[in-house]
Every structure is written in C-alpha cells, then in structure tokens.
Amino acid sequence: MSEESLLERKYFDGIYIPAGLLVFGTVIVKKEWTLYAALAALILGAIKYFRMLPKKVLKPAVFQEFELKEKTIISHNVAIYRFKLPTPDSVLGLPIGQHISIGAAIEQPDGSTKEIVRSYTPISGDHQPGYFDLLIKSYPTGNISKHMASLQVGQTIRVKGPKGAFVYTPNMVRHFGMVAGGTGITPMLQVIRAIVRGRAAGDRTEVDLIFANVTAQDILLKEDLDALVAQDKGIRVHYVLDRPPEGWTGGVGFVTQEMVEKLLPKPASDVKILLCGPPPMISGLKKATEALGFQKARPVSKLEDQVFAF
C-alpha cells in the first residue's frame, strides 16, 4: 500500500471539505438533523476513502499482462524495464521483500515452445503508483532474460504474484547484514529503500551491505546506493570486485568468511543476514555464516531464519 499521509490535499478536497460542508449546511437548514448528517458524512467519507486507496492488481494464481512503457539501457546486457499498470493509481500490491513471477512461451531448439517461469524483484515499490520497474541482466542461456531483452515498447509480459517467504516490517531486527552478488541487489535495494522511507515513522534498522561484482562496470544501481548511504548514516555499503581497477580501495576477490566477520554485524537475536546472488556464492556464504556462529541456514529459507537466502 502507498505510504501516504491522511493530511494530503486529495483527502481534504475529496473527503474532509465535502463532509464538513454537509454537516455545516445541515446545521444551518435543520439543526435537529445534525447527528444524522454527521453519520451520513462519516459513512460517505469512509466509502470515498476506500475508493481512493491504491488498487492492488497482482493475483497469486493468475497471470496478467502488463505493457512495456519504457526501456532504459544501462549497459550492453542490462536494462530497466518500466511496465504500465491498469490505472495511474494502481499498484502491484507487492510486500517489501517479495517478488513476482514472469511467464513466457519460449521457442526451443527443436522448434517447439515451452512455458518458462522466472522470479524477479521489482526495484520500484507501491509508493510509486501507475507502473513497476524491473532491473534485468540478459544472459546468453537465460530464456526469460533474453525474451525480456527482445521486448519492444508496447509489447506485454505475463506476471503473477506476490511470491516469497520474506516480508519486511519496520524494526523487525536491529541490524541487517546483507550480501548481494550482481542482480541479487534488487531485493536488498527494495528493503533498504523501505527502511530509509520509514525513518520519519521511527524505523531505526541499520544495514551493512556487501555488494560483490566482477568489475566496477558491473556494479548495478551504484548511484542509487551511494545516494542512500549519503542520505542515511544507518546504511553502509561495502563494494567487492573480483577484477578491480587500479587504485581500487574496496574489497577484492570473492566474498570470504573474513569479509563477513569484518563488515557485517555479529550474531545476535536481533540480527538477520540476507543473501541473494549466484548459487555457488550463496552456498559458500551459508557455510561461512554458520562457522561465525549464526544459526545454520535451511535449504529453503523461512522468514524466522537468522540467515535468509532469497
């Protein structure tokens, strides 16, 4: 649901002022009907309020089609795809930390078609009505990612959801330790943005994120991450590169147990580790976190787990 205030102008214009005029007019014309007018204003105001709420469009069991509105090329194999929702005030209705499923009929080498489904986490949120954004890296062997790369503005994709075991709520932990590799940054960014937006309402969650990539050019959404770090002292990002440029001052190589111990919070009941990236990286990090004293990660993570892999 959109994070908005009941003091916004649209509520004054659409609810408070009309309700006030109804009650005020009744007092002038027939004072003894004031109570009935107040009840009518309350009922009509409630109806109008619920009609003004953002319309959630996702259906967990049903694929729906959404039109590609805009495509922003980030690099030779990465793009941000913006899809249009049915109305300007529609939202996906996607809880923070969950993802959507994209389905497509993909042609196979033998000429047949096969239904392929893959999961993606939008980098936009329900506070941005009317559209949703997907950051997707295309791989030579990636069925859906190649299909997405071939999409033209005006064409559609099939989406259903929400999916996923993780749902973020403010102050669910004191401190998140995060490790992301490549496009695994998308659920982390979604959670971090929610934390920063929630500061005014009392969200005190701290975040340390290790973001691993091959080269500096592979660091996705670096400007967005750096802006969040500059804006919020409770957010820290530690970049790690396998092939760093000359003069690089960040981490080098694969994310190791020593890096996790040095850069992420220590094991505690109010600490949670979030992981998202290539399977070999996640497998190694599950072993590393267990060796450091965190609870052993399950093969399939659940919300209550101390180490959660998306």
From Swiss-Prot:
Database matches in SUPFAM superfamilies: Ferredoxin reductase-like, C-terminal NADP-linked domain, Riboflavin synthase domain-like
The UniProt record lists the keyword DNA repair: no
Cofactor(s) needed: FAD
BP GO annotations: protein histidyl modification to diphthamide; tRNA wobble base 5-methoxycarbonylmethyl-2-thiouridinylation
Pfam families: FAD_binding_6, NAD_binding_1
Catalytic activity: 2 Fe(III)-[cytochrome b5] + NADH = 2 Fe(II)-[cytochrome b5] + NAD(+) + H(+); 2 Fe(3+)-[Dph3] + NADH = 2 Fe(2+)-[Dph3] + NAD(+) + H(+)
Pathway, per record: Protein modification; peptidyl-diphthamide biosynthesis
Binding site for FAD: 149-164, 175-209
Residue stretches making up the FAD-binding FR-type domain: 61-169
Alphabetized Gene3D superfamilies for the sequence: Nucleotide-binding domain of ferredoxin-NADP reductase (FNR) module (3.40.50.80), Translation factors (2.40.30.10)
EC number: 1.6.2.2
CC annotations in GO: mitochondrial outer membrane
PROSITE patterns the record matches: FAD_FR
Single GO MF annotation: cytochrome-b5 reductase activity, acting on NAD(P)H
Uppermost EC category: oxidoreductase
Membrane topology reported for the UniProt record: Single-pass membrane protein
InterPro entries associated with the record: CBR-like (IPR001834), Cbr1-like_FAD-bd_dom (IPR008333), FAD-bd_FR_type (IPR017927), Flavoprot_Pyr_Nucl_cyt_Rdtase (IPR001709), FNR_nucleotide-bd (IPR039261), OxRdtase_FAD/NAD-bd (IPR001433), Riboflavin_synthase-like_b-brl (IPR017938)
Chain ranges passing through the membrane: 33-50
Record's keyword terms, sorted: FAD, Flavoprotein, Membrane, Mitochondrion, Mitochondrion outer membrane, NAD, Oxidoreductase, Transferase, Transmembrane, Transmembrane helix
PANTHER family, sorted: NADH-CYTOCHROME B5 REDUCTASE, NADH-CYTOCHROME B5 REDUCTASE-LIKE
Subunit organization: Monomer. Component of the 2-(3-amino-3-carboxypropyl)histidine synthase complex composed of dph1, dph2, dph3 and a NADH-dependent reductase, predominantly cbr1.
Function: NADH-dependent reductase for dph3 and cytochrome b5. Required for the first step of diphthamide biosynthesis, a post-translational modification of histidine which occurs in elongation factor 2. Dph1 and dph2 transfer a 3-amino-3-carboxypropyl (ACP) group from S-adenosyl-L-methionine (SAM) to a histidine residue, the reaction is assisted by a reduction system comprising dph3 and a NADH-dependent reductase, predominantly cbr1. By reducing dph3, also involved in the formation of the tRNA wobble base modification mcm5s 2U (5-methoxycarbonylmethyl-2-thiouridine), mediated by the elongator complex.
Similarity comment: family membership: Belongs to the flavoprotein pyridine nucleotide cytochrome reductase family.
Protein's name in the database: NADH-cytochrome b5 reductase 1
Organism: Neurospora crassa (strain ATCC 24698 / 74-OR23-1A / CBS 708.71 / DSM 1257 / FGSC 987)
Gene: cbr1
